[in-house]
Regions:
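Periplasmic binding protein-like
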Residues: 339-370
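N-terminal lobe/hinge region of extracytoplasmic solute-binding protein
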Residues: 49-95, 103
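Gly/Pro-rich hinge or "lid" segments in bacterial periplasmic/extracellular proteins
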Residues: 135, 141-195, 199-202
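Extracellular/periplasmic solute-recognition and catalytic clefts
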Residues: 174-183, 195-250, 349, 359, ...
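Hydrophobic membrane-insertion alpha-helices, especially the h-region
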Residues: 19-37
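Aromatic- and charge-enriched surface segment that lines or borders ligand/interaction sites
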Residues: 90-129, 207
């Protein structure tokens, strides 16, 4: 009993005498734990980007902006729309486009460290025979001549396991059914990109507001972020896509060319605060023609064209304009311009591509040069 009492007093005296040192040690220990657990990864594990992308994608049709980080094709298409070497250093056709021979670059490796050979490159085309006479040559034999074939093989090619040849490697991919929900990319320096996909632009914006992502790629409607002091907005005009109206020329009203022209002249395109597109061909393309009819805003000419329509074409004239949620404000502005001509316009929001329509306002991804 005496020994226990003595030991208790000894411990008590020890804590009383060294309580300040013990308290400081406890604080340092707790602070060190949190520093190692939460702060150190941010300081030493490389840069982390969390990017939001709008759209539903499968693993075989991811956006080219993402694929370009991971993998290459035999060729690539530059900003001017020209086909340039990628995995292949050169190519030729000995028979005017029916047979294409591609020669691979030396010193290329997949992300698993294995050498890129003709046998490890996989393309699947119907009605095309592929021969691999050696490790550095692929021969594509088509049934008919096709001069744009080098553009076709700019499509990236993965090795099994989503292994590519690019700087970034797929370390994790999450699926929701058959759609990609998120994809994690890493590089040798330790940097990481987490790319999350959302079905609508509004859902992508909500993810940004909640902190699920710290950047959004290819945002069409910048509101409300243009007025946010904590958000940096970088405006870029995409030369690879265009906002356009598709007219159904089989429709009883829109089969009239003069009506379609009147609707084009009636839209005040200056309200949209963007660069006007003259056609569905990119200005960077060699085949772009700046001399096409511009259809500048001309309400007087639009009214004259409407007046000159046959009587039966003006009777009960009504147009349904179908669009997606992200383009609703644009569609409503266009509808007001058309209504100024005396046309009844109904705006309908549709989340996909409608099977039937009179006029369809959509974002069109411009394909590469043929």
């Amino acid at each position: 009993m005496f020994n226990l009492r003595y030991l208790f007093r000894l411990v008590q005296e020890f804590f009383l005498r060294f309580k300040l040192i013990l308290l400081v040690g406890l604080i340092i220990g707790v602070a060190s734990f949190f520093l190692i657990r939460f702060v150190a990864p941010l300081l030493f594990s490389g840069k982390l980007e969390k990017i939001g992308v709008t759209g539903n994608f499968h693993t075989d049709n991811l956006p080219t902006s993402i694929l370009g980080l991971i993998v290459d094709g035999l060729t690539k298409v530059d900003e001017a729309g020209n086909v340039a070497p990628a995995l292949a250093r050169s190519w030729e056709s000995p028979d005017k486009g029916k047979t294409w021979i591609f020669h691979l670059k030396d010193g290329l490796f997949w992300q698993d460290g294995k050498k890129v050979t003709s046998k490890s490159i996989v393309y699947e085309f119907s009605d095309v025979n592929i021969e691999r006479p050696n490790d550095s040559t692929l021969i594509f034999k088509l049934q008919n001549p096709f001069s744009p074939f080098p553009y076709i093989v700019s499509r990236p090619t993965f090795k099994k396991g989503l292994l590519g040849t690019g700087k970034w490697r797929v370390s994790k991919i999450s699926l929701a059914g058959s759609f990609v929900q998120s994809i994690v990319l890493t590089e040798k320096e330790g940097n990481k990109k987490i790319i999350r996909f959302y079905p609508t632009e509004e859902r992508t914006k909500i993810a940004f507001k909640l902190g699920e992502v710290n950047a959004i790629q290819d945002l069409f409607n910048l509101q409300p972020f243009e007025t946010w002091k904590v958000a940096e907005v970088k405006k870029e005009i995409s030369k690879g896509r265009v906002v356009t109206i598709f007219f159904n020329t089989q429709d009883k009203f829109l089969s009239e060319k003069n009506l379609r022209q009147a609707l084009s002249y009636a839209v005040d395109k200056s309200k949209f605060n963007s660069e006007k597109a003259l056609s569905s061909i990119s200005p960077n393309s060699w085949s772009y023609n700046p001399q096409v009819k511009p259809y500048d805003y001309d309400p007087a000419k639009a009214k004259k064209l409407i007046e000159d329509l046959p009587k039966e074409s003006k009777q009960d004239l009504k147009i349904k304009l179908v669009t997606s949620p992200v383009l609703l404000s644009v569609a409503e502005s266009i509808a007001k311009d058309w209504e100024a001509l005396g046309i009844k316009v109904i705006v309908q929001v549709y989340s996909g591509i409608p099977s039937e329509y009179q006029a369809f306002l959509a974002i069109y991804d411009i394909p590469g040069d043929p």
